[in-house]
């Protein structure tokens, strides 16, 4: 739903239900549910982006469709005149009407562009006066920023991929070092406009490619669904073929291509260096899934409602076919192929991409003495939010990219940032992961009934768990006063073990990571999840 129609009986909605590929504007009768289509993209290319209303007439004054750049279709001639007046004064900027006085005589207007993170204005409708109120990031020198342009290229199967390319300002745009920056999601998209990372990398001398690979949103159901079950396959081809296109155009130097991204972009980074190991000369993977099976097993409780969507788009781990697909599409399965210099960045408290996703790939590389740089911030989650952590990561990443791709980097950093960088830098040889643990000692036998004791809030709680072990793997069932649960993905390496306790507590399913070590008749370790934090435990046999 968008808002009520002025008759207060119908509701404006956006929908692509049925045979419609694109999201359209429609009206739904609140009583009968009958839907009447109002408008879809006149060019038939993208989903509905936004609908603007007059708060006086309650009528639609404009609709917007975000193609390569936004396209605006006016329904009110006076509003169109105001828009064009501002557009003619400010040039190639995107204009957004934020709010107005009750009589709509004065407007707060914001503008953005590829070289302007944002400026806010006061527009007087009667006088036509346009007054600057403030700039976002006012200390940023706009004159040194690099322009972003729209490109399109064909992927491996001929599908056209929309993308954005930022070329360093002042360069001739030829034979440049390139950094591919895939977006996260992956069910999201990049837009034309100001991009912090694109500008930072361009400032350091790199061309920056931001592809909207299949599976990205905004381009209709067919384009979105074309990414179903294509992680690491055609979705990755869409990125690879973008690199090839820029090399063929003479823009990118094939010997100086890097890839950097976070979340799904981090997955694409790891996929790039495992599935196309000869393509990249440097890679920075930020909060990156390395194992699709363990990624889905660690879905946080507040995502439980969309688990079925993940299974549809990524494969169902509860079927043999789904498990094989996930193994095939997981970069961890091919870690031995990696020959690209790699930096891995992780937040220790990430509820979406668990730390073990990074630990697994780092441990796999360390086990064969392959050099990898690893940063772990203990006070971060899915991405870095604290300025000192972000600055430390950027300082490390730009030095790393410069070393392998030849761009510039700032050698100096504040003592605070330098200290923090030292604190979050992890020696890969100290990283342990159940999937890559090289401990060859016989697996301790965990089979049987156990009493786990945890202390939470000053009170002791007992959990009874019965474990069934088969070689180096185990499953189990739990029971406590709080609820029941099942043990899944249990792994034993020597005396060390990890597992997921999928607990049913007060009608909610919570995945809790269980890590520890065991003797014949005792265990100790930790339960951890975003919902409960970190809770140490001890355990003994329940005889």
Where in this protein do the model-derived segments appear?
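Peripheral, non-catalytic segments that deliver or gate enzyme domains
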Residues: 1-162, 167-174, 190-204, 245-248
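Short coil/loop residues immediately preceding or within conserved phosphate-binding loops
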Residues: 148-150, 160, 254, 326, ...
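Central antiparallel beta-sheet cores of small beta-barrel/beta-sandwich binding domains
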Residues: 442-543
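Extracellular/periplasmic ectodomains of large secreted or surface enzymes and adhesion receptors
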Residues: 56-57, 62-66, 72-92, 99, ...
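Glycine-rich His-Gly loop
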Residues: 65, 112, 181-186, 263-266, ...
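Active-site-proximal cap/loop segments of hydrolase catalytic domains
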Residues: 211-444
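Conserved hydrophobic/aromatic positions in well-ordered beta-strands
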Residues: 26, 61, 121-123, 164-166, ...
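Short substrate-entry loop that stabilizes the transition state in hydrolases
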Residues: 171-176, 181-220, 354
């Amino acid at each position: 739903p968008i808002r009520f129609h002025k008759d207060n009986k119908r509701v404006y909605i956006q929908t692509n239900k049925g045979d419609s590929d694109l999201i359209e504007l429609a009206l739904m009768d609140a009583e009968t549910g009958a839907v009447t289509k109002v408008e879809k993209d006149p060019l038939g290319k993208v989903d509905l982006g936004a609908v603007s209303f007059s708060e006086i007439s309650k009528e639609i004054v404009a609709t917007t469709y975000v193609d390569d750049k936004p396209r605006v279709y006016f329904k009110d001639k006076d509003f169109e005149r105001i828009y064009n007046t501002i557009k003619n004064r400010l040039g190639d900027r995107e204009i957004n009407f934020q709010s107005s006085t009750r009589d709509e005589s004065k407007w707060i207007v914001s503008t953005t562009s590829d070289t302007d993170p944002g400026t806010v204005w006061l527009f007087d409708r009667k006088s036509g006066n346009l007054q600057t109120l403030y700039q976002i990031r006012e200390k940023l020198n706009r004159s040194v920023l690099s322009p972003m342009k729209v490109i399109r290229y064909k992927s491996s199967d001929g599908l056209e991929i929309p993308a954005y390319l930022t070329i360093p300002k002042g360069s001739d745009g030829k034979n440049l070092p390139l950094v591919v920056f895939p977006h996260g999601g992956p069910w999201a998209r990049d837009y034309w406009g100001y991009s912090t990372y694109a500008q930072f990398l361009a400032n350091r001398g790199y061309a920056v490619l931001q592809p909207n690979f299949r599976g990205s949103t905004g381009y209709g159901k067919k384009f979105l669904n074309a990414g179903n079950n294509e992680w690491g396959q055609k979705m990755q081809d869409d990125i690879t073929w973008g690199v090839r296109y820029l090399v063929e155009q003479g823009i990118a130097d094939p010997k100086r291509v890097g890839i950097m991204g976070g979340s799904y972009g981090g997955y694409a980074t790891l996929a790039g260096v495992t599935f196309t190991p000869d393509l990249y000369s440097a890679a920075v993977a930020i909060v990156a899934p390395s194992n699709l099976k363990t990624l889905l097993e660690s879905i946080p409780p507040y995502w439980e409602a969309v688990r079925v969507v993940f299974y549809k788009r990524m494969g169902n781990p509860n079927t043999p076919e789904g498990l094989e697909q996930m193994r095939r599409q997981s970069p961890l399965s091919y870690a031995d192929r990696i020959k690209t210099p790699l930096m891995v960045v992780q937040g220790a408290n990430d509820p979406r991409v668990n730390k073990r996703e990074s630990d697994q790939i780092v441990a796999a590389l360390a086990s064969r003495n392959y050099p990898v740089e690893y940063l772990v911030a203990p006070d971060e989650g899915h991405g870095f939010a604290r300025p000192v952590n972000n600055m430390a990561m950027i300082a490390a990443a730009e030095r790393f990219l410069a070393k392998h791709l030849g761009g510039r980097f700032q050698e100096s950093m504040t003592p605070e940032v330098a200290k923090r960088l030292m604190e979050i830098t992890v020696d890969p040889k100290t990283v342990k992961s159940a999937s890559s643990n090289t401990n060859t000692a016989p697996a301790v036998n965990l089979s049987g009934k156990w009493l786990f004791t945890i202390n939470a809030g000053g009170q002791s709680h007992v959990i009874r768990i019965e474990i069934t072990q088969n070689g180096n793997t185990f499953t189990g069932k739990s029971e406590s006063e709080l609820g029941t649960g099942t043990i899944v993905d249990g792994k034993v390496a020597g005396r060390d073990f990890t597992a997921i306790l999928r607990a049913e507590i007060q009608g909610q399913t919570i995945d809790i990571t269980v890590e520890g070590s065991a003797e014949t008749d005792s265990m100790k370790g930790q339960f951890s999840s975003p919902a409960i934090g970190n809770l140490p435990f001890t355990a003994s046999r329940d005889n």
